[in-house]
């Protein structure tokens, strides 16, 4: 959530931010609502002050046995009580309208973020490795998976439905190896490994920005306040919701690997083949809670951490700085990491690393006690995929395929797999 002070002090910046993000959100009423909210709060404050004064006066006049004056003051007290009830009710209505708008306003992009309308205006920052070339007719990962019998699309559709997949045999072992590699690299870089519930409540989703705006993307559990988590960012960020941390404990760095669930609303027709876009998918996640002065340094470090996994696997990738029109709702600055996928003959997103500044922390009230000011301040939160594991699986299978239809196991995974290749079984 944005800082409310911007409504009064720099409304133009807010309007510009929404324009640059291609947002159609109407905030024209926000200034008047905020002003009315402030006026009502002043009335309530004045009434409470007056009520306290009258209460003291009543005690004095009771002591003087001036019943007439006591009755007059009690009538005045009753009038104030009625005013407070009416004003509080009006404030409740106004505050709800203000909160509805504030919860729908995306984070303000950092000044270093390029202004643009779509992914076409994202900026390439770096490339690593050379796109894989083959001297034979290479196959897409969905064909390799079927040929090597390491997964099953048809039976997953039978068991559940479209956009689901079953890993099996060496395919399941390869997925487990990718989870272990990503977690091992993350923990070696100071991240604390967590194992978390895959079900979260609405308060957690509101804190990280999925609710209320993106409810249609979620799988809700019927007749409850529970949802299947769309990303481990939700659980890891909310771990310290409504808590005050010691400054000396920062930064806090968490990692976890688990299943995630998204309805993929609005994605009809996109990546319909293979395991690139599914309703249920594996992901290893990074979340940082940091001192506000160090969040942009943390973003660079987090991105390098995610990239190091691709380098360990010797997979070509590039880093992209997202423009204002392509950024996530809660982010102030985002790098996408894209891995080379031969079946697409292009790079495909495998990670997003974002600095959310205090946007999520304000929603979730995660604070730290500043040792210099002795005041409680909001932490900055960051999150990043390290990595999207189904896409990483596809990248390994495609980039390491051989002419005979086998797959060479990347050196970094051999110790987890115990084999150096996956071959067709006769």
From Swiss-Prot:
Keyword vocabulary terms for this entry: Aminoacyl-tRNA synthetase, ATP-binding, Cytoplasm, Ligase, Nucleotide-binding, Protein biosynthesis
Localisation per UniProt entry: Cytoplasm
Subunit structure: Homodimer. The tRNA molecule binds across the dimer.
Enzyme Commission numbers on file: 6.1.1.11
Cellular component terms (Gene Ontology): cytoplasm
Family membership: Belongs to the class-II aminoacyl-tRNA synthetase family. Type-1 seryl-tRNA synthetase subfamily.
CDD domains in the record: SerRS_core (cd00770)
GO molecular function, one term: serine-tRNA ligase activity
Pathway named in the protein's UniProt entry: Aminoacyl-tRNA biosynthesis; selenocysteinyl-tRNA(Sec) biosynthesis; L-seryl-tRNA(Sec) from L-serine and tRNA(Sec): step 1/1
InterPro entries tied to this protein: aa-tRNA-synt_IIb, aa-tRNA-synth_II, aa-tRNA-synth_II/BPL/LPL, Ser-tRNA-ligase_type_1, Ser-tRNA-synth_1_N, SerRS_1_N_sf, SerRS_core, tRNA-bd_arm
Name of the protein: Serine--tRNA ligase
The record's note on its domains: Consists of two distinct domains, a catalytic core and a N-terminal extension that is involved in tRNA binding.
Binding positions (ATP): 262-264, 349-352
Top-tier EC class: ligase
Superkingdom field: Bacteria
Catalytic activity as recorded in UniProt: tRNA(Ser) + L-serine + ATP = L-seryl-tRNA(Ser) + AMP + diphosphate + H(+); tRNA(Sec) + L-serine + ATP = L-seryl-tRNA(Sec) + AMP + diphosphate + H(+)
